[in-house]
């Protein structure tokens, strides 16, 4: 494992500990495509899918969250999402019973929100929960550099994320729905 990988694992563990997530519930996949150590990662392969599938079979989750914001310049988020969805498709073809009680939710990153008409689940965030989300993001110090690939937005990642969550809550308020500090929106992925 690279130094970068060790640092990012430590940051992820710190964020999980901050949010009272037991470390025995944290899984690092070590996907083969990701371990190429380069900015341009290797292509996703069946080996990546098998790693994800093995974890899904072990955990049998009721909810899975995948990146729906696929404008990642390195393609990492898209490859991870593709590996998860391919593993789910293989499990579905195999008749996995656990999938009957599982929902797959797609989230967006800090740059864009789902269109209001496409949102299928919205989780309200109190001021304290929004602050906890910010603090969790800030635990990932090695990833705090700017990301200019989606325009000239100079705000930091956590600022964009908070502003996006607050804007979603404001939109729901304008529609006459309950008023919250912020809201995190999701779209459900439904395997064919």
Where are these regions (language model features)?
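Active-site beta-strand->loop->alpha-helix modules in alpha/beta enzyme cores, enriched
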Residues: 1-97, 135-139, 153-159, 167, ...
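Acidic/polar loop patches that form or flank catalytic/metal-binding clefts of enzymes
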Residues: 24, 95-97, 102, 144-149
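Conserved beta-strand scaffold positions in the cores of enzyme catalytic domains, especially
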Residues: 26-28, 104-106, 122
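Residues at the C-termini of beta-strands that transition into short coil/loop
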Residues: 30-32, 108-110, 126
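Short, flexible loop segments at boundaries between secondary-structure elements
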Residues: 89-119
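A conserved mid-domain beta-alpha-beta active-site/ligand-binding segment of alpha/beta enzyme cores
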Residues: 112-169
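Extended, histidine- and acidic-residue-enriched regions that form the cofactor-binding/catalytic faces
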Residues: 182
């Amino acid at each position: 494992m690279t130094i970068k990988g060790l640092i990012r694992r430590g940051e992820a563990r710190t964020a999980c500990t901050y949010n009272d997530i037991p470390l025995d519930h944290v899984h690092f996949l070590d996907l083969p495509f990701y371990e190429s150590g380069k900015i341009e990662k290797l292509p996703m392969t069946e080996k990546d899918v098998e790693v994800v599938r093995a974890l899904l079979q072990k955990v049998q989750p009721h909810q899975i969250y995948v990146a729906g914001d696929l404008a990642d310049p390195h393609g990492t988020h898209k490859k991870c999402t593709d590996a998860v969805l391919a593993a789910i498709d293989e499990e579905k073809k195999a008749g996995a019973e656990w999938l009957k009680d599982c929902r797959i939710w797609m989230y967006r990153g800090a740059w864009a929100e789902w269109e209001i008409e496409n949102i299928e689940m919205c989780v309200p965030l109190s001021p304290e929960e929004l602050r906890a989300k910010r603090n969790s993001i800030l635990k990932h110090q090695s990833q705090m550099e700017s990301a200019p690939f989606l325009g000239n937005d100079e705000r930091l990642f956590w600022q964009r994320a908070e502003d996006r969550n607050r804007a979603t809550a404001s939109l729901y308020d304008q529609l006459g729905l309950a008023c919250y500090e912020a809201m995190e929106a999701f779209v459900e992925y439904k395997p064919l």
